[in-house]
């Protein structure tokens, strides 16, 4: 038992040391974190879920995504209780993660110096912003700090939107709410707004696994941010989440229509469908191809394994 304890201490000590001395995770690190993903990746190693899939996911509900993830065993993917600039501006994107901790002056100086030696410019809270691509969402763990934990104001907000055309998700604060609100298309999910400046925090990791509330976020996760909260979808599950949610929406639309028409009872629609109802649904799909957010081939393949 003592030997096992020593091994664990050494393992986590080495892991922590390597994370602190490598603020930006290497490509190999990111591939290790996201090994389930087999598709296209960015040069930094992050999974690159397609723009088309991001648009499809933007149309689904938090509950639908949550249900699919929970069914797949991913139970730590949702974070709620946000303040936001606009409640009616949902967004999706690919996570670029960052983690901040309370400042330790000596370590902070060494890490700033190291970052500057590696080509980073200015204060460390601007480094993740410089790395953003179109479609990225800057997701940061600032340990819930709002007062003196304002990761961005309107200047950095403009830089973020210029680079990514997406919003941000911060387990921390932001300032300049009025100015941020003038950035057309931008939204921020934060723990609060405060006029203070960012101080006494330090950046210790970029593109590493982070915690947001009770949720875990990996680099390249698909972010679905809506008024209800934010759900973090592992990249390798994004397509499953999309098509399952889309199927449920089609099923519900068909059910609502048939209930209004009086063709079936609520018990028939809410219970296990009979073969006659299933056939009616398939014929309804044939007559309403414009309602399908996926191809009919994708839907048919999905329904082969569906238990209804």
Feature names for model-found ranges:
Residues 1-4:
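Positively charged n-region of N-terminal signal peptides that target proteins for export
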Residues 7-16:
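Bacterial N-terminal signal peptides
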Residues 18-22:
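Boundary at the C-terminal end of the N-terminal hydrophobic targeting segment
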Residues 23-66:
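N-terminal pre-domain segments of enzymes
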Residues 45, 160, 221-223:
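Buried hydrophobic positions in well-ordered alpha/beta secondary-structure cores of metabolic enzymes
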Residues 56-219, 233-308:
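Feature captures the catalytic cores and cofactor-binding loops of soluble hydro-lyases/lyases
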